[in-house]
UniProtKB/Swiss-Prot annotation:
Cellular component GO terms, alphabetical: membrane
Transmembrane segments: 14-34, 73-93, 111-131, 197-217, 274-294, 297-317, 466-486
Keywords: Membrane, Transmembrane, Transmembrane helix
Protein topology in the membrane: Multi-pass membrane protein
Subcellular localization: Membrane
Location (main, coarse): membrane
Domain of life: Eukaryota
Signal peptide as annotated in the record: none
The protein, known as: Putative uncharacterized transmembrane protein DDB_G0291480
């Protein structure tokens, strides 16, 4: 079934990202220990380290150079590592965009992700190479200016900054030997690195970069199926071609997932997606709460929200896919593809009810046969044929409009396909054919028109894609669809307009 094909394709890509997501969370929890500014006084006659007045990250005078040094170091170390922890989420959204064929969103994620994957290791490498070289000058300047109160008495040339000996890479020391005693006091200071975090972060970043590039190459190789046609999610799955299925079976089996009926009902009930959006806001908030309030009591809600995030995206894919994926395929078509689409629609022969109006002379229509009419309708309709298979493609000259001849469902949406330039006719399809229309056309515009109030609203496909991918499709429903679908008596048309450029 189509849903199974989507799940298999999604899982086959997500398996690359999920382990890195878990690793990134572990890195984020430990990012506070990646580096530290250590300082203490060590008495040669003792084994203990007396804490020096320079503390980790804080207690720096705002005017001191060491404060600026610390801020710059956080910029180059802590922030990139925290950003890195969000990259798997970015990768997961890239996977969704890839599976759902949201090319614009996928390209944006790809560019941003590659930039971050290249930039973060460079930030770490630069910080390792440059910052230790500047620390001595920074510390000495602050000592001379009195911004740092040393526990060691400053006596002439005995201070750190006047020593002629060179400092080692990360730590420096000096001895204060008085004439009356032989006690030597050593001040050690510098940046201490946990190298395994640095190395793990760099390896992690480049590994993610390699995986992204591999996925890009793989997608590029499958974009064309050999005939120059657009790659379709359903064309090949376990060596089976869905297009070879019986057309009627395609329609019937697809209605549970791809049917317009279900999508229509789904858009009228945005509460589920709103709740999922709220949960995801809690998930984002848990990051900040963990950062500011510690890791202990926040661990449980963090992982609960993480699970909710997975569940919400799962539901958004396999519930919201009807109002998301099918729209994503509506562009990049060529004129020959539209022609091929029309030919395929003709083969399906969906059941429709044909409504004929009297001709200008007031006579009866000769094409009103085929199954029992319902003449004498007050609104000027001459006859309504019983539902039957549409055996030929009817253009505007042969048919005024099509509608579902069902008292309970007669106000359901009707799909209208307008093809400009190469195809000058306007044709309408009934609701039964909507699944093929959505899947097989990549037309440029997506509109909703309400006939009752003559409102015309263009839906921004890019905004829709973004809101769905971040779990806020409920917001989209409120902004666009909730105010359109007011009650059942409103007829809604979906207009697809193709411009051959």
């Amino acid at each position: 079934m189509r849903s199974d094909a989507i799940k298999r394709r999604l899982y086959s890509k997500a398996i690359f990202i999920i382990p890195f997501w878990i690793l990134s969370i572990a890195l984020w929890f430990s990012s506070g220990s990646v580096y530290k500014i250590d300082s203490c006084m060590i008495d040669n006659n003792k084994t203990t380290c007396i804490p020096y007045t320079i503390s980790k990250y804080t207690d720096f005078n705002s005017n001191s150079q060491l404060n600026q040094f610390n801020s710059s170091f956080i910029l180059f170390q802590i922030i990139p590592i925290n950003i890195l922890c969000f990259l798997p989420l970015l990768g997961y959204m890239y996977i969704l965009a890839s599976v759902l064929k949201v090319d614009l969103v996928k390209k944006a994620f790809t560019i941003f992700g590659i930039m971050m994957l290249i930039t973060i290791p460079l930030f770490l490498i630069v910080s390792i190479c440059i910052f230790p070289l500047n620390l001595r000058e920074t510390l000495c300047s602050d000592l001379k200016n009195g911004f740092i109160k040393s526990n060691i008495v400053d006596k002439g040339n005995t201070t750190i900054c006047n020593l002629k000996e060179s400092f080692n890479y990360f730590k420096g020391s000096f001895s204060d030997t008085t004439t009356t005693t032989t006690t030597t006091t050593t001040l050690e200071w510098g940046i201490t690195y946990n190298w395994y975090f640095i190395i793990a972060t760099i390896v992690f970043s480049f590994s993610m970069l390699v995986i992204v590039l591999v996925l890009l190459i793989k997608d590029a190789n499958t974009l064309n199926n050999g005939d120059g046609q657009n790659y379709s999610l359903f064309e090949q799955e376990n060596d089976e071609n869905f297009e070879d299925d019986d057309p009627n079976d395609v329609i019937e089996s697809g209605l549970d997932l791809w049917g317009r009926n279900i999508w229509y009902n789904y858009t009228k009930k945005p509460m589920n997606s709103i709740l999922l959006s709220i949960f995801q806001l809690f998930y984002i908030g848990s990051y900040f709460s963990l950062y500011y309030f510690g890791f202990k009591f926040n661990l449980i809600p963090f992982f609960i929200n993480l699970i909710i995030l997975f569940i919400s995206y799962y539901n958004l894919i396999f519930d919201g896919i009807r109002d998301n994926y099918l729209i994503k395929r509506m562009y990049r078509e060529r004129s020959n593809d539209v022609n091929q689409f029309i030919e395929r629609v003709k083969k399906i022969k969906p059941k429709v009810a044909i409504v004929k109006k009297p001709n200008k002379e007031g006579g009866k229509s000769s094409s009103g046969g085929g199954g029992g009419g319902g003449g004498g309708i007050d609104d000027g309709i001459e006859a309504i044929l019983e539902p039957r298979l549409l055996k030929s493609w009817l253009d505007q000259s042969e048919l005024d409009y099509l509608m579902i001849n069902d008292d309970d469902d007669k106000y359901k949406p009707i799909v209208e396909l307008t093809i400009i330039e190469d195809f000058k006719t306007t044709s309408q399809l009934p609701i039964d054919a909507i699944s093929l229309l959505f899947v097989k056309t990549d037309l440029s515009n997506y509109y909703i028109i309400t006939n009752k109030k003559k409102r015309f609203i263009q839906i921004n496909r890019g905004l829709h894609s973004f809101l769905v991918l971040i779990g806020l499709s409920g917001l989209f429903n409120i902004l666009y669809l909730k105010r359109l679908i007011l009650k059942k008596s409103i007829t809604i048309k979906t207009l697809f307009e193709y411009n051959n450029r």
